[in-house]
UniProtKB/Swiss-Prot annotation:
One of its GO terms (molecular function) is hydrolase activity, acting on ester bonds. SUPFAM superfamilies: alpha/beta-Hydrolases. The lineage of its organism: Eukaryota, Metazoa, Chordata, Craniata, Vertebrata. This is Lysophospholipase-like protein 1. Palmitoyl thioesterase that catalyzes depalmitoylation of CGAS and KCNMA1. Acts as a regulator of innate immunity by mediating depalmitoylation of CGAS, thereby preventing CGAS homodimerization and cyclic GMP-AMP synthase activity. Does not exhibit phospholipase nor triacylglycerol lipase activity, able to hydrolyze only short chain substrates due to its shallow active site. Keywords: Acetylation, Cytoplasm, Hydrolase. Its EC number is 3.1.2.22. The active site is at residues 124, 179, 211.
Amino acid sequence: MAAASGSVLQRCIVSPAGRHSASLIFLHGSGDSGQGLRMWIKQVLNQDLTFQHIKIIYPTAPPRSYTPMKGGISNVWFDRFKITNDCPEHLESIDVMCQVLTDLIDEEVKSGIKKNRILIGGFSMGGCMAIHLAYRNHQDVAGVFALSSFLNKASAVYQALQKSNGVLPELFQCHGTADELVLHSWAEETNSMLKSLGVTTKFHSFPNVYHELSKTELDILKLWILTKLPGEMEKQK
């Protein structure tokens, strides 16, 4: 199934309150949408996630068949053979979406935002997609975040990093210890592997948090985003 190009990806945008000098691409989990993720975050925080200078882009994955749903159609960034960390990646669909999302990054660059002022991340499958996008294709972005996400054991990301000798973006990772869909141990293993391959990482565990977003997690994420994409006042300090 052909995927849409980045220029026609449906998206929900939260504009900065002031002058736009940085962009954040936040990718939803499987079966969700950009608007759905924005509203979920708003529900958890009791307000929109907003910044003075950062535009937030919540794109929606185009519908495609999804093997874990027995081939049913869902808004997913790529296909999986199954939801586990010990099977091969569906690299063909991942690579198609890397190109689609590269088009979205290119749009921001053409609008005047430098690559080192663009941050990429996501929840669950969205976090996995962000890791592939950044560490295999865009190692010059400001940073990467992955919430309740994991990579498969023989991920193409690990292979790409073995060949890399440049400066890599920092990874901010969060995971609930009570997550029964994406196990906390899978995320820990992902973090350890990336760290061993030269990625600077921050890993936050949240007791009694399932496969979900938490307010504490989002509050910490917001602070980290501001360290990676400071506004004019912060940069001058």
